[in-house]
């Protein structure tokens, strides 16, 4: 997979999701889609299968975090959905990440890409220290989680675009960085605290960017998506 824009389908129902996707019916480039907790928990595996049937790649964003055996079994179930990327929390430890990778790998050796979440882009230094009692600088925490994920055999991490370049320096250029917290220069940052524009994310080395409301809530979602692709992929 090359650089791509992943559109966060943060909708509550199949109807709302397909009302959005229908706007892209005439587009040659089918958006890579992120299905998160709200939509997956509302509609279940059926929504994944229906979207795949339309020809979209899918990042199933459920952020698993539990004891290793539970995560292994859950990943085994997810491996049957034919998604392209899925993820977990790096804070679950190396043992959990290794178990997840084992569960996700199919009998023929194939599997979706497995990505670790480091620190959410809604987390800043103050909230990390006060709420999580983590005193280390946030960029060092991200680097530590990235190193643990790489040593566990994962394909990359979700991180702020502010950390993408440092992650590649630490873990190698082939270790993928998927970066939310991307907004247009003239857009609202919403509840994200560590943000960057698509062009800046490209310059710093992000492999994928995840964009939600700047596209899904735009007056013209197709134009917003194409603008994002032009800034990041072209």
Question: Can you say where each PLM-predicted feature lies in the sequence?
Answer:
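Glycine-rich phosphate-binding active-site loops on the catalytic face of alpha/beta enzymes
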Residues: 81-93, 192-224
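Conserved anion-binding
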Residues: 2, 70-74, 79-155, 163, ...
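Short, acidic/polar
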Residues: 12-24, 69-77, 138-148, 193-200
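A short, Lys/Arg-enriched amphipathic alpha-helix followed by its capping loop at the start of a domain
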Residues: 23-31
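Structural motif
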Residues: 27-28, 54, 81, 152, ...
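Active-site-adjacent beta->alpha loops and helix N-cap segments on the catalytic face
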Residues: 14-19, 39-54, 66-73, 90-113, ...
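Hydrophobic faces of well-ordered beta-strands that scaffold small-molecule active sites
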Residues: 3-9, 33-35, 58-62, 86-88, ...
């Amino acid at each position: 997979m090359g650089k791509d824009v992943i559109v966060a389908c943060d909708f509550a129902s199949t109807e709302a999701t397909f009302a959005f996707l229908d706007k892209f019916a005439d587009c040659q480039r089918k958006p890579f889609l992120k299905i998160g907790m709200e939509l997956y928990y509302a509609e279940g595996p059926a929504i994944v299968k229906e979207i795949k049937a339309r020809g979209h790649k899918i990042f199933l964003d459920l952020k698993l975090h539990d004891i290793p055996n539970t995560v292994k079994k859950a990943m085994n179930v997810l491996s049957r959905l034919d998604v392209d990327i899925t993820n977990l929390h790096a804070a679950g430890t190396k043992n959990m990440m290794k178990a997840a990778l084992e569960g996700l790998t199919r009998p023929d050796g194939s599997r979706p890409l497995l990505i670790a979440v480091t620190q959410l882009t809604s987390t800043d230094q103050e909230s990390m220290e006060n709420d999580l009692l983590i005193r280390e600088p946030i960029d060092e925490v991200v680097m530590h989680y990235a190193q643990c994920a790489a040593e566990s055999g994962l394909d990359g991490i979700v991180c702020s675009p502010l950390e993408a370049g440092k992650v590649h320096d630490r873990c190698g250029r082939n270790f993928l960085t998927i970066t939310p917290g991307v907004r247009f220069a003239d857009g609202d940052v919403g509840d994200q605290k560590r943000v960057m524009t698509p062009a800046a994310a490209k310059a710093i080395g992000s492999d994928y960017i995840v964009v939600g409301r700047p596209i899904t809530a735009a007056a013209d979602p197709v134009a917003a998506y194409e603008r994002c692709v032009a800034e990041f992929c072209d």
